[in-house]
Amino acid sequence: MDSLSLPTVCDVVVPALNVDNLIRDYVSNVRADDSNNVSRFLGEVALKEIKSQVDTSNGDFQKLNVGFRLTPDEKNALKANFPGLEIAFRDSCHSSHSFAAAHRVCETLNIYNRFKTKTERIIDLGGNYVTHAKQGRSNVHSCCPILDVRDGARHTDRYISLAASVENRHRELPVDFCCHKFEECDVKAPFAMAIHSISDIPISTVATHCVRRGVRKLIASVMMDPLMMLYDKGHIPLLNVDWEKEDVEETGKTLIHFHFVDAPGLSYSHDFDTLSQYMITNQVIVNNSYSFRVERTACLSGVYIVEMTLSMTDGHSLAYLKPMRDVSCAWLSSLRKKVFVKLAVPISAEWYTEQFEVRHALMDESLVRYVSEAAFRQFSKTKDPETLVQYIATMLSSSSNHVVINGITMRSGSPIKFDEYVPLAVTFYVMAAWRYKMIAPGIDAVKTRTEKNVDILDEKGLIKEDFNVVNALLEDAGLIEPKLPHFTDVIKNAGLRGFGKKTIEKTRDDVLLIKPRSLLREVIYTVRSVFGLTILDSDYNLVSGVPSHMKATHVWSVFVGNLAFPSCLNVNECVNELLVNHMEMMEETKKEETRQQAFKDARDRALMTIAKAIEKDQTIKDGLLPILDLCKIKEELTAASNSLSLTPEAIEQTDSRLMKASGSDVNPYADSIKEAIHYFNEVEVANTRNLRSLGIYLGWSIPKNKQTYDALQGRNESVRVYVPYENKWYPSAPTSQYERAMTVDGYFSLPMEFEAITDGCRREISKYHLLVVDDSCIFCSGQRMIPALEAALKLVPTFKITIVDGVAGCGKTTHLKKIARIDSSAAGSPDLVLTSNRSSSDELKEVIDCPDVMKYRIRTVDSYLMLKSWFSAERLLFDECFLTHAGCVYAAATLAQVKEVIAFGDTEQVPFISRLPEFRMEHHKVKGKISCTTDHLQMSKRCHSLFKENFLQKQDCEVSERCSSLAELCPIQSVIQIQPERDVLYMTHTRADKETLMRIPGMPKDRIKTTHEAQGETWDHVVMFRLSKTTNLLHSGKGPDLGPCHNLVAISRHRKSFRYFTVAPHDNDDQIVKCINYARSLSSGDLDGVRVLI
């Protein structure tokens, strides 16, 4: 900039959560897991609920990893300075200035988030472009000039960091930087940021080039201290930085040096005149056309956030160019309850002269008050000043240092500088002497008669008005409201001034100023002031507040030719343009969504047509089968089955059997079917949320510590992480094949062969750092059944339901085998036999006598609903119907067009239980006509008569003598006392106990089940175990909804022996323990009395 353009300076909004409702829902839905309690529920479920309502991917809730090792005080300071950032302290590396480095990282993210944009361009003055690239900030352009060797070394370090990122991450890094100065770069952007990089650039230059580059707002962080305006040196505590000013005589400049105490090789020097501009400037006017508002918005442990905001216009007013002379309070937070005390410090010890430097010391207001009061109490005219100064110095010493007695801090203060110790004591002595001298005049002043506002009111409450003859005559002469004083007042004020009388002047309501007046003294003072002799007079203003030069009232003006802002500044035009662009973008987005949806619907209709051909018998040849070898139909069908575009309308258009119900006729079981659809969708949402939370925990990147993978299995041992770059699974290889995996972009289809990912799939997923899977990724049956459930809603069923209700072990499955008609030669259509689980289906295929070609009609209800086309039958036999949601039973019966449904089950055993504790079901039980007239269905061949008295609610059921052995109670202290045995089923009520036993080496994991999972199975020997001493509703059988059904399932799985291993053998609330103890008290005759012989 030339001399003509030098600047001149002149002094001038989640829905609120109801915690009571959360607790109430938890208490009413508590189930088998005894580790669940109120604190865990509030800590996990409520936290998930809050996170689901808050966008944590951007803005104030971003997680920031800080690897520097910090002290607890430094960590607390970072959290206090940046409350909107979720900071994770890793303590993985050490630095001599760790807090300053960590603070700089937090400043960068904090200032970047203040702009609230990821699309608008941002200029970073001297920014670390590698850090921006790693964080995915593609909208940041960094101006990184090389001004000295330190800047060049920074580029080397950034290059090394960038090379490591390219090698490890294998993904695009949005690097955007230049080596030009801010004044020379031509990149334009509406926003700019500077992290400790503008301390050497005059504020007028910054404002000028902000106009040239189209910057509307600049936010910078500057290391400053308000005491720089007062002292020559100081210290910033947490940053551990010493600063010192130095006057350079050759250049006439004042430099300020910053020295990091623990980093001797790290120091900075700036021109103090330039740095101080950011302390005291309120406004910068450029070319009398543009105006920047300068604000210091926050003080963060010695780092001030300075904002320069360009003023917009209304198109006709120039009020935004008016200099603003208000007072900034930027420093007041640091100077609160502080005062400046005047003192004189000797700077020479020569015999012929004594030179004193008069300056101010910053002290606590409470300390000044305490010492000044004590000094006045000890003051005496009989004592010499030296002795009194010693007394005051002693009080200063004890009051300004920490006093600790028995480990308790009784007084805390700030130490006084060595050269200010005695001069401060002299100042307090002068204050005490001056106050002592003012006692006599004060006595005269307080005795002076004065008037209050109430004294000038008359009896009616009106102000008394004295008649002034002179003012009345002047009004008659034509003057308007003359206000000459009364003649008596003039006599009082000027009459005896030369003889020491006083005058009284009213300053404000009920406040009067009493001034002694002496004509002779006033004349002498006037003569002395004319000749400049008053400069040596005494000044007792020894304590003052914040100096005026620290209150930021400066306005800068700068002029540069050919300068114009590149965009519009009219607020009306800018707002209108923004809204118009937003509407156009919304319309374009809507058109694109409509086009994508139309494409998906057309694709799904075509794929459903092909699917019917794929489901045909492979022995039947037609023209569609060769398509499988020509294109990727199977992959497309897999993608289509997971698509939400498979609506019932799409199925209706491809299957002629699905005829719409006419008029108001709908499926009478719609409530149950819709509840099943809603449940499966909620389970899918929960699975997706859990997998995403695991990925977010890893940061969707490869962790440096391999033990992090083990931590993921804390609550779910099925979690696995696949790293494409290493082609390796963590923490261990999978035991199953997965059909999908969660990535940072969502689910990804994962074709596997022999538990290994195919080469083609590996190439496609190489762009991801890692993939996360768990048991929900093996096979997602719920989402595959939804199209069938939705299709069933459109049909009107004609079947009737008969429920064959039998106790555990009474032979319900045997009865089903007898009445099943699956032979193709049977009269009418063969039966359809469905089960709730695969083990029951495999068992029925073995025991039901039918040709192999007809065994496809014996299957699970899930597999039937997942068919692309459903075969029909006249009768549906359903085994263990209460283990499946009633909506699936009704939908299968509707799609099979059956006329009769015979459902086998036990109403006293465990019903269908939701995996989601917060999901409440109302229509999950199959309803129909109860039938248990068959004699042998009223007798249990598996359950001892003892348990009939305690568990079975059916009054007409009986037990068989065949099960004559008693149950055995086995007290244990630890899980390791349970030994692995062959042909034994291990059962427990809670999943936590199951996971604990599965960790024991040698235990058969396939034979360890919960009572809910073991329902419907029969074993000769059963071991029931309990590893928690806390009794829950499952052990006591006092649940309001389930009752003792879990205990009934537990004791009805064995034929020969039942052993109960428990850590709480004396728990009287445990229903099984209570029954076993009761059995021990009975004789064989007592047991025979209740047995029924066959």
From Swiss-Prot:
It comes from the Viruses. Its main location: host cell. ATP binds at G806, V807, A808, G809, C810, G811, K812, T813. This is Replication protein 1a. Its EC number is 3.6.4.-, 2.1.1.-. GO terms for cellular component: host cell endoplasmic reticulum membrane; membrane. Belongs to the bromoviridae replication protein 1a family. GO terms for biological process: methylation; mRNA modification; RNA processing. It comes from Tobacco streak virus (strain WC). Keywords: ATP-binding, Helicase, Host endoplasmic reticulum, Host membrane, Hydrolase, Membrane, Methyltransferase, Nucleotide-binding, Transferase. Residues 88-279 form the Alphavirus-like MT domain. Residues 802-1062 are annotated as: ATP-dependent helicase. SUPFAM superfamilies: P-loop containing nucleoside triphosphate hydrolases (SSF52540). Involved in the virus replication. Contains a helicase domain and a methyltransferase domain. The methyltransferase domain is probably involved in viral RNA capping. Involved in the formation of ER membrane spherular invaginations in which RNA replication complexes form. It is a peripheral membrane protein. Residues 938-1093 form the (+)RNA virus helicase C-terminal domain. Pfam families: Viral_helicase1 (PF01443), Vmethyltransf (PF01660). InterPro entries: (+)RNA_virus_helicase_core_dom, Alphavirus-like_MT_dom, P-loop_NTPase. Residues 68-409 are annotated as: Methyltransferase. It is found in: Host endoplasmic reticulum membrane. Residues 777-937 form the (+)RNA virus helicase ATP-binding domain. Interacts with RNA-directed RNA polymerase 2a. The keyword Zinc does not apply. One of its GO terms (molecular function) is RNA binding. The keyword Nucleotide-binding applies.
